[in-house]
C-alpha cells in the first residue's frame, strides 16, 4: 500500500516496521502524529519519514517493548491515536485489527479454520478459497480483534 499523507515513494509504502518481527498497515489519517512523534523521539524512537503510519508503528513498538500485549497496545491506542483509521498490526506471535471509534474507514474480515483475511472491501477477498463458508463481518468500531496472541 502506498502512502497518501507523505511523499509517495517506496519508503512511504506499507507495511511499516519499527521493531523486530513487527509490522503495521494503516488506512486513514492521524491528526496528532506530529505531537506523538515528538513524544516517541524523546523515548528514543527514530523515524525515517514524515509518514503518520510510521508514527503509529513506532507507538506500537514502544508499547510492546514495555511488555504490553498487542491487544492492550491497540486498546490504549484508541485513546492515544487521534484520527480516523483502521490498523492491522502483526508480530511474531499473532496479529490484530482495530477501527477507530467512529469507524470512518472500511474494513471486512473473513475468518475460516485455515485463515483470517482482512481487507477494505469484500471484493478483495472474493476469490479466496472457501470464502463462501467463511465467517464474514465488519469489525465493530473501537473493538480490538486479535489472533494468536
Predicted features and spans:
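Conserved short alpha-helical segments that host acidic/polar catalytic motifs at enzyme active sites
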Residues: 1-149
